[in-house]
């Protein structure tokens, strides 16, 4: 079962060197939790690291990460696996970069989410939490960012599939996808300096949301697609209609 209230937790952060992943590592280490980062680069603040090897083969990458996480954890179980890996690339169906960007989005979102889901079947405690990184935009068509929309829609479908009884997740475990609009990250501020930052979601809000869900406070039901909408600096979570 998941740890009792007040106990130190054990968490895997897939994408632990990204903007949101780094904040998660910092915040949970500050609570004296054991936090492992899975990313293409080490996070020195993490308790442990699994460095992902870049490859064009999904099976190679999946096997490498699965094997190294298995060696790291042994028989130990974790309270949560937070998949916060991802990225963004635009382009419509006519774009010269369509194939390249679709490939990139698939690697950054679908590969990472699929590997995280498999890790959950092996290493997540009963009653544990798996979060996936969806996108509110992918609830509808995304003609200006075809690859991004397809990849995020696949993540949404994966999350809903994991809620099924025969999904392979441990008893009582929950898979939940967060569907933000725009996160307030340094990269986004640099690329969109004229944007309305009051409509962007602060990373700290998501970190605290993860903390609540890990400790089973206001945790949504498994399979939920949770929209994250920030308006005039106020962020609200609402479940997307099935």
Swiss-Prot record:
Regions crossing the membrane:
none
Q: Which GO terms describe its biological process?
A: L-phenylalanine catabolic process; tetrahydrobiopterin biosynthetic process
Among the GO molecular function terms of this UniProt record, one is: NADH binding
Task: Classify the source by domain of life.
Answer: Eukaryota
Q: Quick check: keyword Hydrolase in the entry?
A: no
Q: Does the keyword NADP apply?
A: yes
Describe the subunit structure. Homodimer.
Q: What is this protein called?
A: Dihydropteridine reductase
* Organism per entry: Bos taurus
């Amino acid at each position: 079962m998941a740890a009792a209230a007040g106990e130190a937790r054990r968490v895997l952060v897939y994408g632990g060197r990204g903007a949101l992943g780094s904040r998660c590592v910092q915040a949970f280490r500050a609570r004296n939790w054991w936090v492992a980062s899975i990313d293409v680069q080490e996070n020195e603040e993490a308790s442990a690291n699994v460095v992902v090897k870049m490859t064009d083969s999904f099976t190679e990458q999946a096997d490498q990460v699965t094997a190294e996480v298995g060696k790291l954890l042994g028989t130990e179980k974790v309270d949560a696996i937070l998949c916060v890996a991802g990225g963004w690339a635009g382009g419509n169906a006519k774009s010269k970069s369509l194939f390249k960007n679709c490939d990139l989005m698939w690697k950054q979102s679908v590969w990472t989410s699929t590997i995280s889901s498999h890790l959950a079947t092996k290493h997540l405690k009963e009653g544990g939490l798996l979060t996936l990184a969806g996108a509110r935009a992918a609830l509808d068509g995304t003609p200006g960012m075809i690859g991004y929309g397809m990849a995020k829609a696949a993540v949404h479908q994966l999350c809903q599939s994991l809620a099924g009884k025969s999904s392979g997740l441990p008893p009582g475990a929950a898979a939940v996808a967060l569907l933000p609009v725009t996160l307030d990250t340094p990269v986004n501020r640099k690329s969109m300096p004229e944007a309305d930052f009051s409509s962007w979601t602060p990373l700290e809000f998501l970190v605290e949301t993860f903390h609540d869900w890990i400790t089973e406070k206001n945790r949504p039901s498994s399979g939920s697609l949770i929209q994250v909408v920030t308006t005039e600096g106020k962020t609200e979570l609402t479940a997307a209609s099935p």
